[in-house]
């Protein structure tokens, strides 16, 4: 539980914490677009330097960000190795039988790896410096113009808030169920792949049952308190967009324009 990052907020008074959640969410959207623009070593290194600077300004321990990467290591390695061995083009760097590593495959693997890390670092920074409630309010506020097109902005924000809130709860339930199964003699680390998959079933069934019970209890509690969504609801804390939020968005946009001018037209250089 201590290593769980998703849905976790670290209180603080840094400049990143004090930004309006709407500006942080907009900055993340722009930042992700910039990441997929960046297609050479220089632009990716500049993005990495910018991200590390933001992490430093947030005054949050670096270990939180590395823990955010850990759950994704398997996917990152699989995707990176897939690019190395199956992307052909450029000069051949290594060949052993049908296995061939080319310069294009290696360059694409590096790009994929850096994009994963940058996106995870920035999204982790967003969740660690923004409360789930503020984040859901930001989503609702940004979707507000779409209400005229029948988009349920408030309900989407509510779902996001509840999802982030239930992630730590589900992890607690998973740990509790695993400990109970281990006490009954279940070994989750032994056997072949099929046996390991089968050993997960005793976890999934009670976990799903517990999740449905919690969701049902939450729905009953909300109905008992007379909950009604939509524009009629008021906010305990009102969002306040300030000059620093505008400057933050301008800074990210300027960074994007600068990196777009540096980017290679088609390949890693």
From Swiss-Prot:
Membrane-spanning intervals of the chain: 28-48, 49-69, 73-93, 109-129, 246-266
Membrane topology: Multi-pass membrane protein
Annotated compartments: Cell membrane
Gene Ontology molecular function, alphabetical: transmembrane transporter activity
CDD domains to which the protein is assigned, alphabetical: EcfT
GO CC annotation terms, alphabetical: plasma membrane
Function: Transmembrane (T) component of an energy-coupling factor (ECF) ABC-transporter complex. Unlike classic ABC transporters this ECF transporter provides the energy necessary to transport a number of different substrates.
Name of the protein in question: Energy-coupling factor transporter transmembrane protein EcfT
Organism per entry: Streptococcus equi subsp. equi (strain 4047)
Organismal lineage: Bacteria, Bacillati, Bacillota, Bacilli, Lactobacillales
């Amino acid at each position: 539980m201590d290593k769980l990052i998703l849905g976790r907020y670290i209180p603080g008074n840094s400049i990143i914490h004090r930004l309006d959640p709407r500006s942080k969410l907009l900055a993340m959207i722009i930042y992700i677009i910039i990441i997929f623009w960046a297609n050479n070593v220089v632009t990716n290194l500049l993005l990495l330097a910018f991200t590390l600077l933001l992490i430093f300004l947030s005054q949050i321990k670096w270990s939180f960000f590395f823990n955010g990467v850990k759950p994704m290591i398997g996917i990152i390695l699989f995707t990176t190795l897939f690019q190395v061995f199956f992307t052909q083009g450029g000069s051949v760097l290594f060949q052993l039988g049908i296995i061939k590593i080319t310069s294009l495959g290696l360059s694409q693997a590096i790009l994929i790896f850096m994009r994963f890390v940058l996106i995870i670092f920035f999204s982790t920074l967003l969740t660690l410096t923004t409360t789930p409630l503020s984040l859901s309010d930001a989503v609702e506020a940004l979707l507000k113009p779409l209400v005229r097109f029948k988009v349920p902005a408030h309900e989407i924000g509510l779902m996001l808030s509840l999802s982030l809130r239930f992630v730590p709860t589900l992890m607690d339930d998973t740990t509790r169920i695993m400990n109970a199964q281990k006490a009954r003699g279940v070994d989750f680390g032994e056997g072949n792949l099929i046996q390991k998959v089968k050993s997960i079933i005793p976890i999934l069934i009670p976990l799903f049952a517990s999740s449905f019970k919690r969701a049902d209890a939450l729905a009953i509690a909300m109905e008992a308190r007379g909950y009604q969504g939509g524009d009629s609801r008021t906010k305990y804390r009102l969002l306040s967009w300030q000059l620093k939020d505008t400057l933050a968005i301008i800074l990210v946009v300027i960074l994007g324009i600068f990196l777009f001018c540096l980017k290679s037209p088609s390949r890693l250089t």
